[in-house]
């Protein structure tokens, strides 16, 4: 009696590649190609924190979960996008990739843009009236593209959310910003230490508005 057997081969590559598969005469051929040979544009999206690193934590709410929820809403938009864009995500579950692997994904894929999504907290971690949206960029980027992208993200978010403008902020002390070789923006959507914003950030409609604003910013920037 014959049985259908399934085999799995896992390959670990040094670079980010797309796989093109062809078959002929019962042989399967795999070609590993640069993402830019397949897609018109390449985007890397990062959900902050994850796993045993929750980020800001307030009233039983973890930043890592809010960051991921927004990213998953953003993924829905990119999945429906009719443009030829390759989008890579540093995480789509409750994992915690290293800082090096996060920025490495952007650099190794030579992404057209790298977007990292976070939420903010006061320095003390105490609840306060401080609120608003800010976006970090790489001041060391001599092309000015990082700041340009950050400004676009901020503008779209302010219009969509009606949040307070906390401006664009130099973020070179942040590893994934400092080490990025591609245009990068790290978005702090809102303050979890503000009662109203914490409530908003947990709201599905608010998360969808956030995702749509960032989607629009990415599309406008890369095209």
What is each PLM-predicted segment?
Residues 20-22, 166-169:
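Short beta-strand
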Residues 123, 136, 167-223:
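Active-site-adjacent mobile loop/cap segments within catalytic or ligand-binding domains
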Residues 5-7, 63, 183, 210:
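Generic detector of short, well-ordered, non-transmembrane alpha-helical segments enriched
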Residues 14-16, 72, 140, 158, ...:
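Residue-level marker of positions within ordered structural domains that often coincide
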Residues 1-43:
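Signal-peptide-cleaved, periplasmic/extracellular N-terminal interaction regions immediately downstream
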Residues 29-163, 174, 199, 208, ...:
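Catalytic-core regions of hydrolytic enzymes
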């Amino acid at each position: 009696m014959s049985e259908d057997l399934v085999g799995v081969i896992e390959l670990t590559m040094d670079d980010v590649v797309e796989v093109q598969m062809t078959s002929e005469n019962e042989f399967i051929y795999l070609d590993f190609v640069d993402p830019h040979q397949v897609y018109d544009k390449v985007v890397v999206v990062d959900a902050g924190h994850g796993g045993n690193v929750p980020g800001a934590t307030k009233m039983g709410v973890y930043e890592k979960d809010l960051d991921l929820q927004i990213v998953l809403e953003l993924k829905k938009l990119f999945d429906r996008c009719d443009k030829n864009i390759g989008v890579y995500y540093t995480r789509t579950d409750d994992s915690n990739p290293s800082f090096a692997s996060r920025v490495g994904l952007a650099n190794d894929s030579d992404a057209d843009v790298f977007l990292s999504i976070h939420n903010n907290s006061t320095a003390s971690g105490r609840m306060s009236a401080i609120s608003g949206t800010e976006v970090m960029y790489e001041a060391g980027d001599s092309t000015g593209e990082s700041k340009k992208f950050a400004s676009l993200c901020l503008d779209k978010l302010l219009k969509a959310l009606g949040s307070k403008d906390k401006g664009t902020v130099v973020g070179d002390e942040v590893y994934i910003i400092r080490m990025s070789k591609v245009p990068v923006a790290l978005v702090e959507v809102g303050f979890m230490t503000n009662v109203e914003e914490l409530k908003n950030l947990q709201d599905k409609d608010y998360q969808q508005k956030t995702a749509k604003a960032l989607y629009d910013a990415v599309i406008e920037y890369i095209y």
